[in-house]
Amino acid sequence: MKTVNQAMRKKDAMQLVTGQPVYMDDVIPQDCLIVKLLRSPHANAIVQEIDTSRALLVPGIEAIYTWKDVDQQGRRYTQAGQTYPEPSPYDRLVIDRHVRFAGDVVAILAGKDEKCVDKAMKLIKVRYEVLPAVLDYHTALDNPVLVHPEENWESLAPVGADNKRNLCAHDESGAGDIEAVLAGCDVVIDHTYHTRACQQAMMETFRTYCSIDAYGRLNVLSSTQIVFHCRRILANALHIPKSMIRVAKPRIGGGFGAKQTSVCEVYPAFVTWKTKKPSKIIFSRYESQIASTPRHEMELHVRLGATKDGIVRGIDLYTLSNTGAYGEHGPTTVGLSGHKSIPLYGKAEAFRFVSDVVYTNHMSAGAYRGYGATQGLFAVESAVNELADKLGIDPFVIRQRNIIHEGDVMPAYYGQVNTSCALDRCLQAVHDNIGWDEKYPVRDMGNGKVRAVGMGMAMQGSGITSVDVGSASLKINDDGFYTLSIGAADMGTGCDTILAQIAAEVLECPLDNVTVLGADTDSSPYDSGSYASSTTYVTGKAVEQCAEQLKQKICQVGAGLLGLDERAVVFAGDAVMSEDGTQRATLAQIAAASQCGSNTALEAVVTHSSEISPPPFMVGAAEVEVDLETGEAQVIRYEAAVDCGTPVNPNLARVQAEGGILQGIGMALTENVTYDDRGMPQENSLMQYKIPARNDIGHIHVVFESSYEGTGPFGAKSIGEVVINTPLPAVADAIYHATHKRFYELPITREQIALAGQ
């Protein structure tokens, strides 16, 4: 292949590294209203009185909106970017009189500049009726304090939700008699694991610009992963027709799932729709830390039974998830905690997976890379590591005895057959590359330091089966180059480049001959958006099929120009030729002919959805140096092997893997969202919220052990999310080998390690 599976430079690389104006605030008019939000200091309260009279007198203030400007009995909406009907409940209003977490919106202010808006905000007087708050998610279910007592709360999908019980979702699934199987096992590992909420912490915070166009429509330019879902969300929130809204995205400075939720778009949209004036909102880092959509905190109870030879016979998993004040992504993230961890163990005779998602008066959780699988894999993989230790079996060996293989039906994965899998090769590659036999389990380095190793494996999905869709539109232009229009959002991942590579491979042209446009609800074909590890697999397949259709049309027109039957010509990349090569029509000639007196449009549009979601696989091993006296733990080496099918662009795939590994290490060791006894988030800046920098980590090495997925473009599967999952169990197991103490809660802090070392 000439372009696919080749390390091509990103199409936008030079513009980004040279600091060209490509992000939202770079490209919008600066003469617009500045929108800011007054937020509640209380975790649960009713706004009794709000006085904005003095604030409205501040010069430059255009408008201040409160709950009085929003129909409190109107239909609610969700900010979750999901295909309709969304599993997430409709539990929000633009401004609600009932504030449900410390940071919830009390008022929207709009003015000519930040100075006047900040001054006006200080002059607003609010009197609250402070209510008891649900701050412990263990006590949320059936608590007498209801987070959502309102009657206009609504759940569109059958996810087991009940707002009168603080229940956002409940589900049960299983196969076989799990109790009988566990009773017959030689050994059962039974533990409860706890993963904290953690922030996506993308460099570009939430931001949106809104204006009214010449047709009176609301135009929205937003840093979002989900332009089409965002249009529906805004229509639902503002109670206006979707036809009156256009949503587009510029370049995005990172998302990691945070921008799969419309966190900020509704507020400038509300202002602009009311005032008919352009407006923008840019969240500060403080706001992005205290009023965003962090990963769901989860508690996972695992019972895992096996034979004395280490064959896993049964897995019983119960997950309790804290969705916070609103239910965005609550019903769906929790499912992945079981359905993306249990299927790795193909010899299990029985499984049971039960989950509850509860409301609390914490900041609303949301989507974050890994989307629930991360939490579930930490628990299940940690249990398998403990099983290996208890039986005296090497962790790699016990997995080789249990893993699923190509052609196996995957347990807890909706009956799907494993259509492509190199998990066995991934295990061997990581085992060899890290020098496992020489380093396992721990080595004393002297001076109070030890080096230990740990490992884990992971899977994810490739899109959402039979739900989300990807689309592509492709046309040839008058000089013989192509324009690819997509609705997927490149958020720094390089999907514009990858999708162009797929088109270029089919059309046998240089990558530079394919220009990419997207995403824009007015001009792009419908696409669910960039999430659920779907872009390469789902949208990429649409691009491949679209390019094939366009190539066929080009051959039809070329054959007509040559006076030949369509079956007598061949496509040669830059031309259509007769089979013997004696006659030739160039792409430029064919494109020009299609634009003069032609009834044939040299354009193709394809929408694609997959009935299966083939999982990518990954194995990772961490070498961690631990100072037993100070508790400092540093990952000095991380080895990973990934099966993502055919890597369309190995360089970009490797960058994805390295970044995900770094995020996973942060979740294992430092990242944590905590609250004080009033429900106020404590880590409100990047000084308190510690994300690892590149120099905090030693050597990261990634290899690809490729299977071939026949349903993907050129054999490709996803890679975006699976890469974050292995560091959690791997680092935790390495620290166990260093300290001889198991940790069942993340992050594992320096203080905890120091105490264990003593």
Please annotate each region the language model reported.
Residues 232, 253-276, 280-281, 495-503:
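Thiamine diphosphate
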Residues 6, 12-18, 82-85, 161-208, ...:
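Glycine-rich loop/linker segments at domain edges
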Residues 1-160, 274, 595:
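Flexible, low-hydrophobicity surface segments
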Residues 74-79, 120-123, 222, 231-233, ...:
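Short acidic, glycine/serine/threonine-rich loops at helix termini
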Residues 147-238, 403-481, 606, 611, ...:
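Helix-loop-helix junctions that connect adjacent transmembrane helices in secondary transporters/permeases
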Residues 85, 97-98, 241-249, 273-284, ...:
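Conserved catalytic cysteine-centered active-site region
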Residues 462-524, 539:
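Catalytic phosphate/nucleotide-handling subdomain of diverse soluble enzymes
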Residues 67-68, 239-244, 274-279, 308, ...:
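C-terminal catalytic domains of large/alpha subunits in multi-subunit enzymes
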